[in-house]
């Protein structure tokens, strides 16, 4: 058997890849093109092996049934298995553990370094707000994550040191998500040099509207107020650009991630980075004053439209749906809104105009930030997945908040996060009735 590869070691490790979907194909290409001196891929496995047959590109390997993994490992065909099944890797991990097969993990906490340890540039201004650190970093590298084309750039340097702060601040153990596209230190991947000043807003989870809003709106607000004239790199999703345009950032200063290519390294002349200093305390983590200043700026651009409904039900159509509630909610005069049918600005306007919003918890709940003082927001939770994402901002903004769950005790949350759920009819009705009472009391209605 071969020894584990370490930096500076010239011994290759024979590995197998499990998973040959889009993510697996990109990782296979990265490892065979740029890491051939560190890792030798000798086997590829996928449950769809009968349809896939073999790999594509310069290196051709047959694709095998994952059930063959234990026997192949016993026969010393490979040393470790690299799982390339994103968002569905727990069962494969368990399978490997049960059969005593080591898993290959590319990247870990030892690769993360604070921004203060990178090459510092000259600051043309200061942020001037307590609770934030501000950096200008020179010659920082960026590489697209292979698992999600619209979401993330890794930020690192030529020594393979990854920026510790480049993460979603609500998911601090983010190194577990890192699946480096290639060996980062002294990589052989093609380098593309980008002159000028950049702010990178494509962090982990930036493909989620709530996470993007809460992690990045305050950053843009602070930089714009300080006089930043550089460009922003945003997710290739509508809200990535639209929220910045609502903060008066012109389109020519917004770059969507889809203009970048996989398996290339982008060398940024200067990156401007604003980091919230944690802990703020829960109330500020989930709704800092700076975030709410940015929201207030957006709300000033909105207007009341009498043609829009005053009661809206924001319905989920993917996973974690609220089942069997549509007709009951409609009885109380709610108009059903499916967010996917509206632009970001249209969604924001619907929330701004509504007196009462009934929303199933999810990223679409983010738009409660744009509700008016004295309105009511009902948020429906499955007992498998509850949090305070919107509590503190709503309390500060003067929006009455009615969180409601299925009122069930859940003892095992492993597989329940994405489940659909139901409410007892009596609970659904009393929640809506309470919302009416609160709104009427606030506005002097009988």
Segment roles from a protein language model:
Residues 45-52, 87-88, 237-239, 362-363:
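Short, polar loop motifs at secondary-structure junctions
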Residues 110-446:
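The feature primarily captures lumenal catalytic ectodomains
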């Amino acid at each position: 058997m071969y020894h584990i590869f370490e930096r500076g070691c010239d011994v290759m490790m024979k590995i197998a890849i499990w998973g040959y979907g889009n993510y697996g194909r990109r990782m296979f290409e990265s490892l065979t093109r740029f890491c051939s001196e560190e890792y030798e891929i000798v086997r590829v496995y996928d449950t769809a092996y009968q349809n896939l047959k073999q790999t594509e590109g310069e290196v051709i390997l047959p694709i095998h049934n994952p059930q063959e993994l234990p026997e192949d490992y016993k026969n010393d065909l490979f040393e470790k298995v690299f799982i390339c099944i994103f968002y569905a890797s727990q069962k494969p991990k368990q399978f490997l553990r049960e059969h005593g097969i080591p898993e290959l993990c590319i990247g870990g906490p030892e690769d993360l370094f604070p921004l203060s340890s990178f090459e510092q540039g000259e600051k043309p201004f200061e942020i001037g707000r307590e609770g934030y650190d501000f950096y200008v970093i020179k010659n920082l590298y960026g590489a697209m994550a292979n698992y999600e084309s619209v979401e993330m750039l890794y930020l690192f340097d030529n020594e393979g040191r990854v920026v510790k702060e480049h993460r979603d601040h609500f998911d601090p153990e983010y190194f577990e998500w890192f699946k480096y596209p290639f060996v980062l230190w002294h990589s052989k991947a093609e380098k593309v040099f980008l002159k000028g000043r950049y702010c990178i807003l494509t962090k982990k989870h930036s493909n989620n509207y709530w996470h993007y809003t809460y992690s990045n709106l305050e950053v843009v607000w602070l930089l714009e107020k300080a006089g930043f004239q550089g460009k922003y790199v945003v997710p290739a999703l509508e809200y990535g650009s639209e929220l910045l345009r609502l903060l008066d950032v012109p389109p020519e200063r917004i770059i969507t991630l889809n203009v970048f290519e996989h398996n290339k390294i982008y060398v940024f002349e200067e990156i401007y980075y604003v980091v919230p200093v944690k802990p703020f305390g829960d109330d500020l983590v989930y709704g800092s004053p700076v975030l709410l200043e940015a929201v207030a700026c957006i709300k000033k651009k909105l207007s009341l439209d009498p043609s829009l409904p005053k009661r809206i039900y924001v319905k989920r159509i993917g996973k974690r749906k609220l089942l069997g509630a549509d007709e009951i909610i409609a009885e109380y005069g709610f108009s059903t809104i499916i967010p996917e049918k509206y632009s970001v600005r249209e969604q924001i306007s619907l929330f701004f105009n509504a007196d009462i919003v009934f929303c199933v918890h999810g990223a679409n709940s983010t738009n409660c930030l744009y509700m008016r003082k004295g309105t009511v927001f009902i948020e429906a939770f499955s007992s498998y997945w509850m949090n305070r994402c919107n509590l503190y901002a709503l309390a500060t903004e003067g929006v009455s908040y009615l969180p409601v769950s299925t009122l069930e005790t859940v003892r095992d949350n492993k597989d329940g996060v994405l489940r659909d759920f139901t409410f007892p009819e009596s609970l659904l009705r009393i929640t809506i009735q309470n919302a009416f009472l609160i709104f009427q009391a606030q506005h002097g209605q009988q």
